[in-house]
Amino acid sequence: KAIRRQRQMCIRDRVNIEKNAPVRLLNAVMERIDYSKLYAAYSRLGRIEYSPKILLKIMVYGYMRKQISSRALEACCRENLHFIYLLEGQCAPDHNTINRFRKNILTQEAGQDILRQLVIMLHERGLLSLEAAFIDGTKIEANANKYSFVWKKATAKKTDKLLKRIHEELPAKLKEVGIRFYIPEKIAVRQLKKLRKRIYARIDADGIVLVSGKGKRKTPIQRLSEWIDQCLAKLKQYTKDIHICGNRNSFSKTDHDATFMHMKEDYMRNGQLKPGYNVNVATCSDFIIGSYISSDRNDVHTLIPFMEQLRKNYAGRNIGSVVVDSGYESEENYCWFEAHPETELYVKPRNHEAVKHRKYRTDISRRENMAYDAQTDTYTCANGKLLQRTREKKTHTASGLEIAISVYECNECDGCPLKEKCIRACGSKKPMEERYKVIYVSKRFARQRQAMEAKISSSKGCLLRVNRSIQAEGNFAYVKQDLDFRRFLLRGNMKVAAEWLLFSLALNILHLHHKIQNRRLGSDLKIPSSFPAGL
């Protein structure tokens, strides 16, 4: 007689993932990282709620797969086999756990240490070369309300109006209640507090009952105390806003580190300002080796602190050359690289493209189109008149660098037929008949720009400039277009830096996987097929 057997359902507990899947490469690379600083970032009290190594793995892989929100990452950990493979049998973390890890742990030095270890690992295995670093910047919108702007100049005007109003109205109000108090032209917050304290003391001494509501008549001293409170609150707010602005011209009320700036994505086509951050990235062999998040709208002031950060992170490993675009050119940046000759600078001068046009070369008002005599230190204008050096002017940058500017003037401009073409208006209120030609020249900057023009025109300079466009700008294109990232999720400079750190790790793993699959390991510079052979 046949034996009946109960049917059984076979459940496979192993996760089948392709051998060449990016998640396997990510897991193998992240297992070689030292997480001692990451664990040290946690408090010593209590236990760690979830393994930070696993959290970092799932977050980096999520950024590789366009899943960057904490709730999307939580859902992926429950449903996606690749994320389950990274969990190593543990339960899926809660979205609050993921968010706390991103905001509180990666914002510290431990996050930058992980990127540094990854770069050094690639460098020691010959996959990354530090011979040339390509730096570029882009503006990314902050997670702040669009119309939450505070303008520094407007706040300064409001402060002046408020101080003027206090200076004009306060004496009469004090005279009405019989209080004597010295009022300076610009009264400070502490002086208003001192006056308010005296008013409260008078109210207590006289036994005055403070009233409010309809049908109640306030005493003059109560109206004065309320007026002082209003002025004091406004003055405190204006002082705080100016302090938050610092060297900037604006900030957002919902993200104090964000600055209002022009974005490339201007859908309204009206030049609308949006709160954002200036993200600077250094790339070597397609890999991101460092990033610098700035609230400055201009790239000029970000190069030196970025280089100091790279020198600190990779101490003992010298970066041979740094290639940047024309937005980073300044005399101060030239001087910094002259003081650090171990790193060579390649920057395209701002007038590099303009010089090629006939309009620029035929502009007689420009110093570059005038003949210069080094022996007599004079310039000769288009009409044959001499511009002689009359004085030397000293200026200082924000960091304290002294810049010497030579002033050249021409005293023979009366009756010149080329005067209107040679002297530009520039908003001057003087009539053209009373004006004369004046040019301001920084000889050191002119020498540095001339030397840089020759350097970037060489064969090596042309190759490096081409690779800067491919490698540095290519990373931004991949993040914005392929990963569809146009706006930060977190607020604050430190948290934004942690968010961009995850993108840097994700991009490096993706580049490494792509190089392995296409067998392009060890290729540092790309030579386009259209590149001139003679350069």
Region roles according to the model:
Residues 1-7, 11:
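Single conserved hydrophobic/aromatic residue that forms the stacking wall/gate
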Residues 3, 54-55, 94:
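N-terminal alpha-helical segment
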Residues 18-60:
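Basic, short loop/linker segments at the boundary and entry of helix-turn-helix/winged-helix-like folds
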Residues 32-37, 80, 84, 482:
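A short secondary-structure junction motif
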Residues 46-47, 87-91:
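A Lys/Arg-rich helix-loop hairpin that forms a DNA/phosphate-binding surface
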Residues 59, 66-78, 91-535:
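Anion-binding and metal-coordination hotspots
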Residues 69, 84-85:
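Short active-site-adjacent helix-start/loop capping segments
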